[in-house]
Amino acid sequence: MTTDTAGYTGARLLADTIDALAERAPAVLAAAAEQMRGIRLGLRFNDGSAVSLTVRHSRLVIGPAAESDVEVAFDDRAMNLLFDLQRHPSDQVLPDSLDVRGESDRVLAVWRAFSLLSQRAAGLRFVQGLWRDYRHHRPQLWGHAIPAPAPEPDASEPGGWHALDYLERRRPEATRTDDETRVGGTVTTRPRLLWDGRDSTPWWDELPIADADLYDTMKACRARVAAEMTRLVPDREPRADLYSLVREYPARQGKGLRPTLTIAACAAFGGRPRDAVRAAAALELFHNGFLVHDDIADESTHRRGLPTLHARYGEGLAVNVGDALNLLAIDAVLSNLETLGLARTLALIRETLHMCRESVEGQAIELGWIHRNAVPGTDDDYFLMSTKKTGWYTCISPCRIGAVCAGVTDPRVLDRFDEAFRLIGIAFQIQDDLLNLVGDQAKYGKELLGDLLEGKRTVMLIHLLRTVADPAERKQLTAILGKRRPDKTRRDADTLLAAMRAAGSIDYAVDLADRLAARGIDHFERDLDIIPDNEGKAVLRQIAHYVTTRPL
Amino acid sequence: MPLRAPLERRWLHYAFLSRDSGQSVIANLSALGPDGDGHAPHRTTILLVHDREHGWHSSQFNADRPDHPWSSFRSPHAIGVAGDFDVAARTGVPAVKLRLRRTGRPCTSQSAAFGGGEHLRWQSEPGVLASGLVRLPGIERDVELLGYHERVRGRWSWPALGGWVFGFVNDPVGRSDEPPPTAVVFTLIQSRDPRAAASGSVMLWRRGRLVRHFPRRAFQVAVHDVLDRDQVVLVPPLARALGTAPAASVPRRLLITARSGSDRLLLDFRGSTAARIANPCETGLPAFSVHETLGACHVEGVVAGRRLDFQAPGIVEFAGGTGDADDH
């Protein structure tokens, strides 16, 4: 968020809003980007600032003012009404307040995109806070049309004694200051009447919530699951050679995707977030156990920005730590018996066993390819391996396990997660592999080009070897791939990367990830329509779109 | 009168709060008509205790109860004369051993008709005093409580009844052996069949006497936000073990405005925790849920020319809202 007053411009506000939505509610941005595809939008504000807005893949990209297809100029009245907390979004328009120029179909597309942005983002508490902050620091951007507070009602007045009036205007809820580990409550909803003196609306008819704040939810889920993992790891001897090491990888916190999926799926089905925390912690322990072993198998040197466990303490201790993490994870799953009861715990054991089986099978497929210096010929081979190795434990199983924690054990319901999150999981893995090649190491955490050094069979590599026609080049690439990791040099990795760029493998993978994610999102909306629109489902939706808007 | 038909019901409900809201006691003693000739009526009793430090504790539905429970509706007691009220889980905890005393006069909150000849009559009595012992695992506390008692009789079933929202608040100031200066009770029946049969009332007691009854056309009820699901505890313990299906979220804030002539009343309740009682439903497998919600309540207004303005702990009950109960 901007800190100096001079930075509080209309252009900066738009950029901050787009950045916040990319991180917190990517589904909103994806919907807006869908409307604006192929249109270059120019925006000017009454403080003199200007920007351009374009669409790249499913991302809205802010840039300096440039030639545009549609130009929009906001005056202070338009700013006052756009995103105004006091007014309904449909009341935004004032005559002559907006100057919009361009071809009519494109103007309408831009209007749809902004309607989507304002209507769907306006309920997020963070976005409300962002705009309040700007309005406080640069009130001139908005003019001075802030409505006065409503007067107290007069007992003799015939009207003015309405329950909604109190909740909306006279005694609105103050900004919530719940502690950071609370899951939910990232959006505001409107008060509603249960009884107006004539008609009744059941109290259990909840208002649908389509979007939620992914960032805040992830933060809360990460914190709760990290605390649970700390509790699950024993504080006893041998500390130096086992339990202290067991804590190392869990302490190197990741994004918190799995904990969020698990807890959100539980909440989506009406369960208590608390009931999914231990299962989510068990998944994280399994995951960290797999990582320790995976790093040894891949001969990786870095994990989440620090040396890998075996690089620091040797392979013997590291293997044992991986085993211990898996044991602790099993113990954690079983310990749900006392809180969730027998039926749900049995279902959790079943789901966990399935997840572990998929993971070791996927790992076997990939290690077999590397061992034989084979590169699969089709993307489908990669999809199968990726789904087994990471798709189940990263995406599909967390959702299913979260639903089980809420009391759902019917396979026909649980299976509805599979196809959506299989596709999203593959897209996510492709993106992760792309980040290893073209990402920012500080943000990415792993060693850049590490996948090329360890010979990981990625979509880019498969595409490259499928595309390269020159036998000499193919021979050279195969020879590099056949080297053991310690024998590969940075130059070898650079050669592979250059060949991928030349063959268009990077762009191919970006496009493929986008298409897979879009199919996954389509399945999400269709297959999971049995879940009502609530905040838990809204978080799952944001994660489904997270892949398409994650910056590369 | 003995219960004869399967859906005939008689509920005695008790709810008490300590003046600092540190302890809350809720008990429901229910009787349901027999399944047929020669069968005895079904009797269930559940006891819930909430302690600020130790959270919710609940018996199963088979709590031990008095043969002749204290109730001014069953056998009228003189004001100020105490009667025993001992209810305990079969395991021994939670348990309450209380002496109850009336301080005011009960009154009918509403008589509602809905469904195919179904009906209920709801009678309320705020300002009931309770003193004695509350027992939780490893803890025993002497308590002085102020609360509410009701009787609901009639013949009803789900889903015809749908659900209800009901609550009470007693102004806790004044001497502990006197009726509260002010007490408010409200009821809103949200029948599902037919929807138009919804009915309700808001009632105000002053020093033990009912001084105003706002009929259903004279008040509004609104809600905002939902209670954090982590603050909703499923009871009785057996319901957790059975993996009872989730229910709708409980509203976090409830606001009632009532107006009649120059009288007006505002009740603003903010829930903080709730126990969801999963009741076995006689007409199908899915449970019917009653959420006992504890929270802070602010009451203000002008009634009969006198201003009132107080804050006190209150209890609001949200009944219904189990999605799968809709499928009966």
What are these regions (language model features)?
Chain B
Residues 1-328:
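Structured soluble/peripheral alpha/beta segments that form catalytic or ligand/cofactor-binding pockets
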